[in-house]
């Protein structure tokens, strides 16, 4: 079985909110070219925008850039968002949220911190690595039946940068 190397598109943009729209337009065009459905394209745009907004809001005190790479396979797209800003502690993040009580109205939920859960819901696989900055890898398969049954949440394991 021959493994095909993915086509890769890379971009670096300032970590400023006005560039999140540029990234959304870029990923929309790429996903459309690959043949994703309208709903999947919208999900991908939201997930990528959330990841970029996290960089804008949390990675840097001032200035800085975010790197994006789009790895295009026959059956999926892997999107990697990186920054060189403040590292992210997943365990501390989980503890800060506390348990979510489903019996309470949504207005009573703690504000903020739901971006990663939204990303995890919209994408098929999510992996995060914290080191000198954050690397967030998100995968969306073209077909639902290609999603690996073992994918069950946000993974804080090592993600190799491609």
From Swiss-Prot:
Pfam families: HATPase_c_2 (PF13581). It comes from the Bacteria. Belongs to the anti-sigma-factor family. Its EC number is 2.7.11.1. InterPro entries: Anti-sigma-factor_SerPK, HATPase_C_sf, RsbW. The lineage of its organism: Bacteria, Bacillati, Bacillota, Bacilli, Bacillales. NCBIfam families: PRK04069.1, rsbW_low_gc. PANTHER family: ANTI-SIGMA-F FACTOR RSBW-RELATED (PTHR35526), SERINE-PROTEIN KINASE RSBW (PTHR35526:SF9). The keyword Nucleotide-binding applies. One of its GO terms (molecular function) is ATP binding. The keyword ATP-binding applies. Negative regulator of sigma-B activity. Phosphorylates and inactivates its specific antagonist protein, RsbV. Upon phosphorylation of RsbV, RsbW is released and binds to sigma-B, thereby blocking its ability to form an RNA polymerase holoenzyme (E-sigma-B). It catalyses: L-seryl-[protein] + ATP = O-phospho-L-seryl-[protein] + ADP + H(+); L-threonyl-[protein] + ATP = O-phospho-L-threonyl-[protein] + ADP + H(+). Keywords: ATP-binding, Kinase, Nucleotide-binding, Serine/threonine-protein kinase, Transferase. This is Serine-protein kinase RsbW.
